[in-house]
Amino acid sequence: MEKVAVIYWSGTGNTEMMAKYVAEGAKAAGAEADVFSVSDFSQNQLTEYARYALGCPAMGAEELEDSEFQPFYEAVKPALNGKKVALFGSYGWGGGEWMNPWKADAEAAGLVLVAEPLAIENAPDDAGKAACQDLGKALATA
């Protein structure tokens, strides 16, 4: 089974929690999965993995976090063309609309989304945990 990198940025810890659950799901499906905060992941590590879960919460006016995550995403996007990817993140208000332009951008860049992006309001509850694990399983088995 191919290796999965779960890479996230989290301000409150909610998206970090989601990242850990996504990795649990990938591991339960038989994949090797590693979790990284965006600041701890080097672009050079991309070649070590075949599948990627990218997590970022909604920030400001329903957009990706722009000081660390957005620059990272823009830098790695060309290398992820044709790769299997899952998108996830948390939000505190609004309806999670930031995920729609992110999904469209990822698809336009050639990322192969294995499932609908997962947006969870605040911290994941038991249903949110299960949804994160299901996303990880989908990524591992797609």
Features from the language model and the residues they span:
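FMN-binding flavodoxin-like domain, especially the glycine-rich phosphate-binding loop
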Residues: 2-3, 14-17, 21-38, 48-142
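Aromatic-flanked redox-active Cys/Sec active sites in thiol-based oxidoreductases
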Residues: 8-12
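Helix-turn-helix
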Residues: 41
